[in-house]
C-alpha cells in the first residue's frame, strides 16, 4: 500500500511476510520433520511413520544421516519462522517535500539495531539510479544517490519488476524529488 499527495509520498515495504516465505517455511519444516522421524524410527527399530517398515533403513549410516538432515532442516525452518514473525525487512520510505526530509525505516533482527532509521535532507539527494543487470536471472534495482553517503537501495533485489514498471517508478520518484535519473 502506498500513499501519495502533492507534498508527501509514503511507500510501505513488505518485508519477510511474503507467501513464498510461508510456503518455504512449511515445506522445510514438514520435510525435515519427516527425515528426523525416519532417522529416529530406524534407531528405535519401531515404525513412527507407517510408509515403510523401519527394518528397511538401518541406523548406521542411513539413519544417522537422515537424523542429521532432519535436525539441520528444523534449524533452518525455525530461522525462517523467526524472520517471518519478526517481519524482518518491512518498513516504509517517506519522502516529505514540505519538510524537505526523506525517512527510510526498516525492521531488522532483534538486538541493538532492531530499528533501522535513516533520515536525509532532500537537497542532499543527487539522483535516482536505476541498475539493470541482464541475463538469465535479470534484476532491476532502484537506488537513491545521497551526497556523502553513497547509494541506498529503494527496492529489494528479489522484487521482479518489469522494465516498464521500474522505469515508471524511477520516473515518478525522480519527478517527485526533482532529481535526475541515472542508468547503470
Curated annotation (Swiss-Prot):
InterPro entries: PSI_Ycf4_assembly (IPR003359). It is found in: Plastid, Chloroplast thylakoid membrane. Keywords: Chloroplast, Membrane, Photosynthesis, Plastid, Thylakoid, Transmembrane, Transmembrane helix. Its main location: plastid. One of its GO terms (cellular component) is photosystem I. It is a multi-pass membrane protein. One of its GO terms (biological process) is photosynthesis. It comes from the Eukaryota. The keyword DNA repair does not apply. Pfam families: Ycf4 (PF02392). Seems to be required for the assembly of the photosystem I complex. PANTHER family: PHOTOSYSTEM I ASSEMBLY PROTEIN YCF4, PTHR33288. Belongs to the Ycf4 family. This is Photosystem I assembly protein Ycf4. The lineage of its organism: Eukaryota, Viridiplantae, Streptophyta, Embryophyta, Tracheophyta.
Amino acid at each position: 500500500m502506498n500513499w501519495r499527495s502533492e507534498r508527501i509520498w509514503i511507500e510501505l515495504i513488505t518485508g519477510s511476510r511474503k507467501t513464498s516465505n510461508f510456503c518455504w517455511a512449511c515445506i522445510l519444516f514438514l520435510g525435515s520433520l519427516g527425515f528426523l522421524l525416519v532417522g529416529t524410527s530406524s534407531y528405535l527399530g519401531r515404525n513412527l511413520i507407517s510408509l515403510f517398515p523401519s527394518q528397511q533403513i538401518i541406523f548406521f549410516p542411513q539413519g544417522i544421516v537422515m537424523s542429521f538432515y532432519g535436525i539441520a532442516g528444523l534449524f533452518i525452518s525455525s530461522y525462517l519462522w523467526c524472520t517471518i514473525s519478526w517481519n524482518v525487512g518491512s518498513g516504509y520510505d517517506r519522502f516529505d517535500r514540505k519538510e524537505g526530509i526523506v525517512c527510510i525505516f526498516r525492521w531488522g533482527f532483534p538486538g541493538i539495531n532492531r530499528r533501522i532509521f535513516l533520515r536525509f535532507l532532500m537537497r542532499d539527494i543527487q539522483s535516482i539510479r536505476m541498475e539493470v543487470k541482464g541475463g538469465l536471472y535479470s534484476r532491476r534495482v532502484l537506488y537513491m544517490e545521497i551526497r556523502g553517503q553513497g547509494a541506498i537501495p529503494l527496492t529489494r533485489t528479489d522484487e521482479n519488476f518489469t522494465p516498464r514498471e521500474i522505469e515508471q517508478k524511477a520516473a515518478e520518484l525522480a519527478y517527485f524529488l526533482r532529481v535526475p535519473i541515472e542508468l547503470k
